[in-house]
Amino acid sequence: MTDIKPYRHKYDGAYCTVDTFRHLLTGNEARAHLDQMAEILKKGAIYVLGLHLLPASGITSSVVRWKNARGRLNVHTTMTVLDIDRKRRKETLSVSLRVHSGNSKHKIRSVYKLRTYTLRQLRSLIRRTGRFDILSTYDNLYDLNRPITPDNSTEDIILLLRKTS
């Protein structure tokens, strides 16, 4: 995400959703990613950036669960916030998958370090790049007919960015 090679042609759009951006653990890595994305996009191109924000009052839930099934395949997912260090801007997240398919059962657990962003910190980062304007913002339902006005309580945000230079 920080070693994007230039291509022969520039692109009209790109996306980075589902919180992937927060795997960039330093401000320098985040800035490098945005700068490199700007290099491969045409002027006026769209970049969709989606991530989880840290609200001023803290997160509303430290555990999120969901399950999905298709035929004989069942997947149960549990995401648990293990720690948030506001000073260092680090979150420790555990993701557990329980997979059942017929007689087969698997359990997978991963622990990730993620960078935290408040709304102010995210806006500041984008402004400092000088390469993108925020066109509109959405929640994680991605409904283009329902833009949101984020505030300090916003937890999930999708930014529709336009490359300016």
Describe each region flagged by the PLM.
Residues 2:
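Adenine-nucleotide cofactor-binding loop residues
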Residues 22-24:
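A short His-aromatic
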Residues 48-124:
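SAM-dependent methyltransferase
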